[in-house]
Amino acid sequence: MSFDIAKYPTLALVDSTQELRLLPKESLPKLCDELRRYLLDSVSRSSGHFASGLGTVELTVALHYVYNTPFDQLIWDVGHQAYPHKILTGRRDKIGTIRQKGGLHPFPWRGESEYDVLSVGHSSTSISAGIGIAVAAEKEGKNRRTVCVIGDGAITAGMAFEAMNHAGDIRPDMLVVLNDNEMSISENVGALNNHLAQLLSGKLYSSLREGGKKVFSGVPPIKELLKRTEEHIKGMVVPGTLFEELGFNYIGPVDGHDVLGLITTLKNMRDLKGPQFLHIMTKKGRGYEPAEKDPITFHAVPKFDPSSGCLPKSSGGLPSYSKIFGDWLCETAAKDNKLMAITPAMREGSGMVEFSRKFPDRYFDVAIAEQHAVTFAAGLAIGGYKPIVAIYSTFLQRAYDQVLHDVAIQKLPVLFAIDRAGIVGADGQTHQGAFDLSYLRCIPEMVIMTPSDENECRQMLYTGYHYNDGPSAVRYPRGNAVGVELTPLEKLPIGKGIVKRRGEKLAILNFGTLMPEAAKVAESLNATLVDMRFVKPLDEALILEMAASHEALVTVEENAIMGGAGSGVNEVLMAHRKPVPVLNIGLLDFFIPQGTQEEMRAELGLDATGMEAKIKAWLA
């Protein structure tokens, strides 16, 4: 989309943060209004993360106005809220390409702009990185400032508190801004509290506090009295005791939509020494009423008509794999009151909304705490219950030691329902489910299943749920099922594949939902097609049978080739000294960028055309 200067006259003056800082303060509320309208206009045309960015407009303007970015270093946690940041930092005219193949990255990305200090996508990393950046800046000695912006969801993760605990110990000069976007402004936010925040962050208060500490430091009773007096004054109106105990100077909460007030407070805090903590209250979806009323639905949006206030309804076609899982979960829970379901803040994405309503006493959203989710499941299993951890492939990486140490070594019957396995599309490198087969396959006695359609997905979930000799995992992709008939649930024989088609010379061993594409290739090349079903344990007898009766084998998976299912097939053949040639088709050895799933599969040669071309070139 072309930028309409007449529609956004103030925003048109800002092609960089240097130009932003030349604007008079009085024009900034108008700039915020235009920035918010431009965000609505652009995202509604292109799709993308939406409600979070609407809530951080004033904060973004204030931070870039007060701090000398990019010299001063601004870090955004996760990055859903960073669209206004991208618009103000030279990427305004490209914002319509965000999350598209070859377009702007969905999150702050170091390779895209010097303003993006840290590449992000997973939550709760900003403070840890910020401490390192602040320590490096201190050693550099150029008075470079460091600011981290973290949301109220991301700050619940243990990593954020580990970082704050460390910051309180080594006391780097840095600012952490907590963007608290609950549904309404806290009743503490008002004229008195904003005035107090500016007073407590001001130089007079700071110098009096530090001077008083020095004067009375040798008189323990007076020193303790001063400390307690300060805490009591702040404690009457601020909820920052926890952050103060961690060693931060806490200011807030303040109105995160008062851009001029934010600028005053940030200017006061900019030169304070040691770790500083600013708590701001914002409203997710601010300025667009439908998003304010339903920020979860408007968190990430497809293209939509902003005048209608409604997102396009689903065409009502095939169900998603997430829904297939959610329906199976409810069906199983109705028959077995031992079932317990756990998610790390992914209720909607994992298809668990209905379950959470029907079985609230057996539904546990542990927030952004993947490590805790897995070990909590271990505890439930020890207690005689049947835990299911519903988690995205990319987020299970964060709990790898817990899978190993707390579940697998103890052979606990925990079922991992791994959503978003394989290529996920528009969220790019940080969210592709490229590695789960590789990092799970090496865990002793782990059962790993790869369904080829929604019916197999249900059967495998059922099989894993009733497997009591250790952990099991079922991995399935983002997107819709293929439309096969659902049959009554029954346990599958562990470690057994099935031959779907008999051909000649070439056998294709398929792992997972690339099966429809593999079937087209098998038909075209008159190849045998095998649905392997299990990555662990592998059906060694079937692999050896295929090796004995065919001239070559091809493995197909939507996982990294390195260490994946195909690697397992190679290991079986080598262990049995079978000299049959094998072509492994899967995800290559690089981080896969954003694009639609169809675009990226075509580019990587994972559609039928690409697979057939790879096989023919290999056989030539």
Swiss-Prot record:
<feature type="binding site">
    <location>
        <position position="370"/>
    </location>
    <ligand>
        <name>thiamine diphosphate</name>
    </ligand>
</feature>
<feature type="binding site">
    <location>
        <position position="181"/>
    </location>
    <ligand>
        <name>thiamine diphosphate</name>
    </ligand>
</feature>
<keyword id="KW-0808">Transferase</keyword>
<feature type="binding site">
    <location>
        <begin position="121"/>
        <end position="123"/>
    </location>
    <ligand>
        <name>thiamine diphosphate</name>
    </ligand>
</feature>
<feature type="binding site">
    <location>
        <begin position="153"/>
        <end position="154"/>
    </location>
    <ligand>
        <name>thiamine diphosphate</name>
    </ligand>
</feature>
<dbReference type="InterPro" id="IPR029061">
    <property type="entry name" value="THDP-binding"/>
</dbReference>
<dbReference type="Pfam" id="PF02780">
    <property type="entry name" value="Transketolase_C"/>
</dbReference>
<dbReference type="InterPro" id="IPR020826">
    <property type="entry name" value="Transketolase_BS"/>
</dbReference>
<dbReference type="InterPro" id="IPR033248">
    <property type="entry name" value="Transketolase_C"/>
</dbReference>
<dbReference type="GO" id="GO:0005829">
    <property type="term" value="C:cytosol"/>
</dbReference>
<keyword id="KW-0784">Thiamine biosynthesis</keyword>
<dbReference type="InterPro" id="IPR005475">
    <property type="entry name" value="Transketolase-like_Pyr-bd"/>
</dbReference>
<dbReference type="InterPro" id="IPR009014">
    <property type="entry name" value="Transketo_C/PFOR_II"/>
</dbReference>
<dbReference type="InterPro" id="IPR049557">
    <property type="entry name" value="Transketolase_CS"/>
</dbReference>
<dbReference type="GO" id="GO:0008661">
    <property type="term" value="F:1-deoxy-D-xylulose-5-phosphate synthase activity"/>
</dbReference>
<keyword id="KW-0414">Isoprene biosynthesis</keyword>
<dbReference type="GO" id="GO:0009228">
    <property type="term" value="P:thiamine biosynthetic process"/>
</dbReference>
<dbReference type="Pfam" id="PF02779">
    <property type="entry name" value="Transket_pyr"/>
</dbReference>
<dbReference type="Pfam" id="PF13292">
    <property type="entry name" value="DXP_synthase_N"/>
</dbReference>
<comment type="function">
    <text>Catalyzes the acyloin condensation reaction between C atoms 2 and 3 of pyruvate and glyceraldehyde 3-phosphate to yield 1-deoxy-D-xylulose-5-phosphate (DXP).</text>
</comment>
<comment type="pathway">
    <text>Metabolic intermediate biosynthesis; 1-deoxy-D-xylulose 5-phosphate biosynthesis; 1-deoxy-D-xylulose 5-phosphate from D-glyceraldehyde 3-phosphate and pyruvate: step 1/1.</text>
</comment>
<feature type="binding site">
    <location>
        <position position="152"/>
    </location>
    <ligand>
        <name>Mg(2+)</name>
    </ligand>
</feature>
<protein>
    <recommendedName>
        <fullName>1-deoxy-D-xylulose-5-phosphate synthase</fullName>
        <ecNumber>2.2.1.7</ecNumber>
    </recommendedName>
</protein>
<dbReference type="GO" id="GO:0030976">
    <property type="term" value="F:thiamine pyrophosphate binding"/>
</dbReference>
<keyword id="KW-0460">Magnesium</keyword>
<comment type="similarity">
    <text>Belongs to the transketolase family. DXPS subfamily.</text>
</comment>
<dbReference type="GO" id="GO:0000287">
    <property type="term" value="F:magnesium ion binding"/>
</dbReference>
<feature type="binding site">
    <location>
        <position position="288"/>
    </location>
    <ligand>
        <name>thiamine diphosphate</name>
    </ligand>
</feature>
<dbReference type="InterPro" id="IPR005477">
    <property type="entry name" value="Dxylulose-5-P_synthase"/>
</dbReference>
<dbReference type="GO" id="GO:0052865">
    <property type="term" value="P:1-deoxy-D-xylulose 5-phosphate biosynthetic process"/>
</dbReference>
<feature type="binding site">
    <location>
        <position position="80"/>
    </location>
    <ligand>
        <name>thiamine diphosphate</name>
    </ligand>
</feature>
<dbReference type="GO" id="GO:0019288">
    <property type="term" value="P:isopentenyl diphosphate biosynthetic process, methylerythritol 4-phosphate pathway"/>
</dbReference>
<keyword id="KW-0786">Thiamine pyrophosphate</keyword>
<keyword id="KW-0479">Metal-binding</keyword>
<dbReference type="GO" id="GO:0016114">
    <property type="term" value="P:terpenoid biosynthetic process"/>
</dbReference>
<comment type="subunit">
    <text>Homodimer.</text>
</comment>
<feature type="binding site">
    <location>
        <position position="181"/>
    </location>
    <ligand>
        <name>Mg(2+)</name>
    </ligand>
</feature>
